[in-house]
Curated annotation (Swiss-Prot):
Residues 161-175, 222-235 have a biased composition (Polar residues). The gene is Abi1. Pfam families: Abi_HHR, SH3_1. Interacts with ENAH, Abelson murine leukemia virus V-ABL, ABL1, STX1A, SNAP25, VAMP2, and through its N-terminus with WASF1. Part of a complex consisting of ABI1, STX1A and SNAP25. Part of a complex consisting of ABI1, EPS8 and SOS1. Interacts with EPS8, SOS1, SOS2, GRB2, SPTA1, and the first SH3 domain of NCK1. Component of the WAVE2 complex composed of ABI1, CYFIP1/SRA1, NCKAP1/NAP1 (NCKAP1l/HEM1 in hematopoietic cells) and WASF2/WAVE2. Interacts (via SH3 domain) with SHANK2 and SHANK3, but not SHANK1; the interaction is direct. The keyword Acetylation applies. InterPro entries: ABI (IPR028457), Abi1_SH3 (IPR035725), Abl-interactor_HHR_dom (IPR012849), SH3-like_dom_sf (IPR036028), SH3_domain (IPR001452), T_SNARE_dom (IPR000727). It comes from the Eukaryota. It comes from Mus musculus (Mouse). This is Abl interactor 1. Keywords: Acetylation, Cell projection, Coiled coil, Cytoplasm, Cytoskeleton, Nucleus, Phosphoprotein, SH3 domain, Synapse. GO terms for cellular component: cell leading edge; cytoskeleton; filopodium tip; growth cone; lamellipodium; neuron projection; nucleus; postsynaptic density. Residues 158-285, 318-348, 361-392 are annotated as: Disordered.
Length: 481
């Protein structure tokens, strides 16, 4: 505020007075210069003096005008800021008035209303009259309610007539199987016992080996080695017929559960010469399915480097039996076997419930035994792959040297760079993949001018500069001996 008052009272009026004085001085200076130019003998000197007065007078007037204009602009800025402050204060006052009016209006509205007395009570109030509990009445289940619902109504009415009552029930109960599924002789080791609420099936002795599949004396000599005895005939799960000396349904039903079940097999024959290191007779006594599966997997994978994956029409042919029985070939639809479990004895759990019924249903559909193959079929279906080629003998130094002729041994050619790192020879053929690469044949001479950190070199070969892999060349110093 003081600055505004000083501008209005002092600076701006003084600027006006200075301009008026300059105006009067300019009039007097003009009269003097005119008289001096007329009366002076030296006109040039008088003209120069007139120019000097004119320049000084104009500069003085321009300075005074500039000072007065700055003072006026500063005055306008101060007044504009004061106007903004006044506007803000006026807006604040108007908002305060509006708030006061709203308070007064609410107070007046509150006067017109009546007070409501609320009594505080508990949120949960017990009912005054307790409801009597409804007695439960058991209603019999009507199984015929949904008989006329669904797409089978038309078929039933067309077949049995509209007057016949519809069938009650949707599941047909089949007759119990005539035989129980094979169970291990000792069931106390499992997690389910007789004293548990879930009843188990009675153990049944495993079936004996039929006489048709006994080991023949003609094939005893070629099946005494432990490696061939361990490779079992892995039967698919869809067949329940016996294979070789097993002759039981345990090969089909129990394979889906993975429970080891002992299978009695004939003792190994003593006729024929035994191979050195043959397994003793105790190894042929009992073999579980898990161990046989593990042995068949390991023997088939260790004989060759590749294992043929089972397909929809896989062929099992020419595998020796577990106990030295005859060889059989069977074409069947197979499923990929699960990974071989660890060869350890697990508690034998009897099969109960749905699994046992499914096993009996599968086992009750026997399949005819497969015919024996001719004697000239090999023992294993997958022959081992050919051995890898022998390694190259590098004892002779000439075998490892790339044969090349260096036409630039005496001196570098004209297209060779003046400054290069080393001179290398190509040990492989290389065809460029990009435009900035080199293409060369084995034995080409290349002058390296730069080595990159990524293994690529930059060099010159036959007047062409480009990049090439560093592992395709060798330093020429290695071959100068």
């Amino acid at each position: 505020m003081a600055e505004l008052q000083m501008l209005l009272e002092e600076e701006i009026p003084s600027g006006k007075r200075a301009l008026i004085e300059s105006y009067q001085n300019l009039t007097r200076v003009a009269d003097y210069c005119e008289n001096n130019y007329i009366q002076a003998t030296d006109k040039r000197k008088a003209l120069e003096e007139t120019k000097a007065y004119t320049t000084q007078s104009l500069a003085s007037v321009a300075y005074q005008i500039n000072a007065l204009a700055n003072n006026v602009l500063q005055l306008l800025d101060i007044q504009a800021s004061q106007l903004r402050r006044m506007e803000s204060s006026i807006n604040h006052i108007s908002q305060t008035v509006d708030i006061h009016k709203e308070k007064v209006a609410r107070r007046e509205i509150g006067i017109l209303t009546t007070n409501k007395n609320t009594s505080r009570t508990h949120k949960i109030i017990a009912p005054a009259n307790m409801e009597r509990p409804v007695r439960y009445i058991r209603k019999p289940i009507d199984y015929t309610v949904l008989d006329d619902v669904g797409h089978g109504v038309k078929w039933l009415k067309a077949k049995h007539g509209n007057n016949q009552p519809a069938r009650t029930g949707t599941l047909s109960r089949t007759n119990p199987p005539t035989q129980k599924p094979p169970s291990p002789p000792v069931s106390g080791r499992g997690t389910l016992g007789r004293n548990t609420p879930y009843k188990t099936l009675e153990p049944v002795k495993p079936p004996t080996v039929p006489n048709d599949y006994m080991t023949s004396p003609a094939r005893l000599g070629s099946q005494h080695s432990p490696g061939r005895t361990a490779s079992l005939n892995q039967r698919p799960r869809t067949h329940s017929g016996s294979s070789g000396g097993s002759g039981s349904r345990e090969n089909s039903g129990s394979s889906s559960i993975g429970i080891p079940i002992a299978v009695p097999t004939p003792s190994p024959p003593t006729a024929g010469p035994a191979a050195p290191g043959a397994a003793p007779g105790s190894q042929y006594g009992t073999m579980t399915r898990q161990i046989s599966r593990h042995n068949s997997t390991t023997s088939s994978t260790s004989s060759g480097g590749y294992r043929r994956t089972p397909s929809v029409a896989a062929q099992f042919s020419a595998q020796p039996h577990v106990n030295g029985g005859p060889l059989y070939s069977q074409n069947s639809i197979s499923v990929a076997p699960p990974p071989p479990p660890m060869p350890q004895l697990t508690p034998q759990i009897p099969l109960t419930g749905f699994v046992a019924r499914v096993q009996e249903n599968i086992a009750d559909s026997p399949t005819p035994p497969p015919p024996p193959p001719p004697d000239d079929i090999p023992m294993f279906d997958d022959s081992p792959p050919p051995p890898p080629p022998p390694p190259v003998d590098y004892e002779d130094e000439e075998a490892a040297v790339v044969q090349y002729s260096d036409p630039y041994a005496d001196g570098d050619p004209a297209w060779a760079p003046k400054n290069y790192i080393e001179k290398v020879v190509a040990i492989y053929d290389y065809t460029k993949d990009k435009d900035d690469e080199l293409s060369f044949k084995e034995g080409a001479i290349i002058y390296v001018i730069k080595k990159n950190d990524d293994g690529w070199f930059e060099g010159v070969c036959n007047r062409v500069t480009g990049l090439f892999p560093g592992n395709y060349v060798e330093s020429i110093m290695h071959y100068t001996d």
